[in-house]
Regions:
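An amphipathic, basic-hydrophobic helix/alpha-beta surface used to engage anionic
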Residues: 1-165, 217, 231
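Short, conserved, surface-exposed binding loops centered on an aromatic residue
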Residues: 103-105, 145-147, 174-178, 204-208
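Short, charged loop segments at secondary-structure junctions
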Residues: 164-199
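Von Willebrand factor type A / integrin I
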Residues: 185-271
């Protein structure tokens, strides 16, 4: 029964037939190949995610994830009319007076969802299926939000995707039904095998200025990731990190919006 997310393959078919009396029975093997891709379940991100440290209060998680970023094109002197959050503190240290960021509000929001399927190193020593499946479900839900808001988005991962060449691991940002169907199919085909370290993806995407928002989803933040994730921080990108477990999130830059899964009172995760 195909009751779990994944790729299911049906091979050769054995056909047996005959008359009602069972006197003349014939059989035949038919060459047959068919695969069924079971998609991940949706997850309610408002119910299942919480800002790490709860720094954002009761504000909508969905709003923080899809809020349109704007490109910073310069700075100007603070007049007292601008929001305090727009103050550019680095310039204050340089010029000795408060400066605020100037934004290009025509800048198009384009997102890239990054999925890390590695739970520990080496990855095969512990595969946390519950954490991985919850992460994959969150990815589906976020993709649906981007689609609904007509925000072009892409997807990239470091895991092997069943039925595809090993290096075919990225969907470039776009919109449309065909693009979204491909995205869902990738999620259904995702395996638990790691093709390469996630750090390679962070390095490749670091200077991709056509992407305004990075959404990183991982079962946990390993020590090896910390410097690479923090290096993504700049004035041109909005970084969102969603981790199933909250370990090492305290070592991630406060300029990165961090989320983790809500826990029940007994310490278990809502699923």
């Amino acid at each position: 029964v195909c009751n779990k997310r994944g790729r299911y393959i049906f091979g050769d078919v054995f056909i047996l037939g005959g008359d009602f009396l069972g006197l003349n029975i014939t059989s035949k093997v038919v060459n047959f190949f068919q695969e069924i891709i079971v998609l991940p379940k949706r997850i309610d991100i408002e119910r299942n995610l919480i800002p790490y440290g709860d720094y954002y209060g009761d504000l909508s998680v969905k709003r923080w994830i899809i809020e349109d970023p704007t490109m910073i094109i310069g700075i100007k002197e603070y007049t007292g009319q601008e929001p305090v959050k727009n103050i550019h503190w680095t310039s204050y240290l340089k010029y000795g007076k408060l400066m605020v960021k100037q934004f290009d509000f025509t800048y198009e929001n384009t997102a890239m969802i990054i999925f890390n399927g590695e739970c520990v190193r080496p990855y095969w020593s512990e595969i946390d299926e519950l954490a991985l499946e919850n992460c994959i479900s969150i990815i589906r839900s976020i993709g649906e939000i981007f689609k609904e808001r007509k925000i072009p988005f892409g997807f990239v991962t470091n895991v092997f995707i069943y039925g595809l060449p090993r290096k075919e691991n990225m969907i470039y940002p776009s919109l449309g039904e065909s693009h979204f169907y491909t995205f869902l199919e990738y999620l259904g085909r995702i395996s638990y095998s790691i093709s390469f370290p996630i750090e390679e993806i962070f390095q490749k995407l670091k200077n991709k200025n056509f992407i305004s928002t990075f959404v990183i989803i991982t079962p946990r933040v390993l020590n090896e990731y910390i410097n690479y994730i923090n290096s993504l921080v700049d004035e041109l990108h909005k970084i969102i990190l969603i981790s199933y477990y909250d370990e090492n999130l305290n070592l991630i830059s406060d300029k990165i919006q961090k989320f983790t899964f809500k826990r029940e009172k007994d310490g278990t995760f809502i699923s």
